[in-house]
């Protein structure tokens, strides 16, 4: 699994952090997404896919 986040698209909603807190965080100053783990373990793949699906700005791309 490869994860790409587009910080220019991110609106700071935080949905990704709620769905996969071990993989995503937000910058303190503006809430923009930060990718914590570029290659998460298989146990987190479903949560990462969910985060990408629910992102209101479509700022997260996941490829296998």
Swiss-Prot record:
Electron transport protein for the cytochrome P-450-SU2 system. Induction: By herbicides. [3Fe-4S] cluster binds at residues 10, 16, 55. Binds 1 [3Fe-4S] cluster. One of its GO terms (molecular function) is iron ion binding. Residues 2-29 form the 4Fe-4S ferredoxin-type domain. Pfam families: Fer4_13. This is Ferredoxin-2. InterPro entries: 3Fe4S_ferredoxin, 4Fe4S_Fe-S-bd, Fe-S_cluster_ET.
